[in-house]
């Protein structure tokens, strides 16, 4: 049986119960990545000069191009080509595969996806600060932001590649790690471009407060994603990545997975969200658990998608059509990872082959 086939299996409930309340190093490698999402954003101008790649952003993003202050221009390290990044992809994917059973079966998929989200999600369109370009999460106050709690494990997981390849930037490493995570657990192909540069100027480290509060309502969610230029459909789509990983109380004061298949990229988040939920009685933050098994969780910002009519129609749409969800997510996630980065025409988007594809 291939690794991909193995991953497309649900984790038994007995294994889920074993993971709750554990206080060990593996249980901290969590999947609470979209609960504390995004700042705001603007697309790089050159993104629109490459519409032939089929990864065209929304009209909302086009409106955000004017008026940005800082220009973050990507540049591939001298002597490097996309082949070097495919090799790097493979090395990261092999390590992810080797730790497939970590965190009681969640693996590193949610952790690395959350890291890619949060390094990109500090972006602010008004002044073109934050985002994945500078790799600033290694500096305070971003590194100690409460919304980034637990992501030190993700950075540590990838650090060996930064140590091995001096030419590799943190921004490229962390965003590529997110691409690996999505693709290697059965998700869609994510177009990606290299060339982000590390920033040593600590005055450019974004302040805390750009990553949102998971306890809020639908209007709050719209405001957070609207600051990036995402509309309601794109917002719902991106939050659908909650199919991966789980929350850990020691990191976020939320606990548990969103469903039983937390090491597989599917539309299960939307299917489950449409089921019946109730407020969990416990000593942590307010969260919801499913009526059927009391085993899975939803955050208040998740439930907001169900309670707001402008969101709900897209929840139903993606619950009914996983293929459409995959297609939309591929575009939106790629957009997120590139917020604030200006790519010259010479740096084209690429799709990496998964390990299973290369084994054929």
From Swiss-Prot:
Catalytic residues (positions): 118 (proton acceptor), 258 (tryptophan radical intermediate)
GO cellular component: mitochondrial intermembrane space; mitochondrial matrix
Main location as per UniProt: mitochondrion
Cofactor note (record): Binds 1 heme b (iron(II)-protoporphyrin IX) group per subunit.
Gene Ontology terms for molecular function: cytochrome-c peroxidase activity; heme binding; metal ion binding
Family named by the database record: Belongs to the peroxidase family. Cytochrome c peroxidase subfamily.
Protein name per Swiss-Prot or TrEMBL: Cytochrome c peroxidase, mitochondrial
Organism listed in the record: Debaryomyces hansenii (strain ATCC 36239 / CBS 767 / BCRC 21394 / JCM 1990 / NBRC 0083 / IGC 2968)
């Amino acid at each position: 049986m291939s690794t991909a086939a193995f991953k497309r299996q649900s984790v038994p409930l007995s294994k889920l119960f074993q993971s709750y309340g554990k206080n060990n190093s593996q249980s901290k490698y969590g999947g609470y990545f979209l609960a504390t999402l995004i700042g705001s954003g603007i697309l790089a101008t050159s993104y629109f000069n490459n519409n032939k790649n089929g990864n065209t952003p929304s009209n909302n993003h086009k409106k955000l191009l004017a008026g940005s202050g800082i220009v973050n221009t990507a540049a591939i390290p001298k002597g490097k080509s996309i082949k070097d990044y495919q090799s790097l992809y493979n090395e990261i994917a092999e390590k992810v595969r080797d730790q497939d059973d970590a965190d009681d079966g969640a693996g590193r998929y949610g952790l690395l996806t959350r890291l890619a989200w949060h390094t990109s999600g500090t972006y602010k369109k008004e002044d073109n600060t934050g985002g994945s370009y500078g790799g600033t999460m290694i500096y305070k106050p971003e590194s100690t932001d409460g919304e980034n709690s637990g992501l030190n494990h993700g950075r540590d997981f990838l650090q060996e590649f930064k140590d091995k390849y001096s030419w590799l930037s943190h921004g490229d490493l962390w965003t590529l790690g997110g691409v690996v995570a999505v693709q290697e657990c059965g998700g869609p192909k994510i177009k990606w471009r290299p060339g982000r540069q590390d920033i040593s100027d600590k005055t450019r480290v974004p302040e805390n407060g750009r990553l949102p509060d998971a306890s809020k309502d639908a209007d709050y969610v719209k405001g957070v994603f609207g600051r990036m230029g995402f509309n309601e459909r794109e917002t719902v789509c991106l939050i659908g990545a909650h199919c991966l990983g789980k929350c850990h109380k020691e990191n976020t004061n939320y606990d548990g997975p969103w469903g039983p298949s937390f090491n597989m990229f599917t539309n299960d988040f939307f299917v489950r969200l449409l089921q019946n939920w109730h407020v969990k009685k416990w000593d942590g933050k307010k969260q919801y658990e499913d009526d059927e098994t009391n085993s899975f969780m939803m955050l208040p910002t998740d439930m907001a998608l169900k309670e707001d009519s402008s969101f709900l129609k897209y929840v139903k749409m993606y619950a009914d059509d996983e293929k459409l969800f995959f297609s939309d997510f591929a575009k939106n996630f790629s957009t997120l990872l590139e917020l604030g980065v200006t790519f010259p025409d010479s740096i084209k988007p690429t799709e990496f082959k998964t390990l299973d594809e290369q084994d054929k």
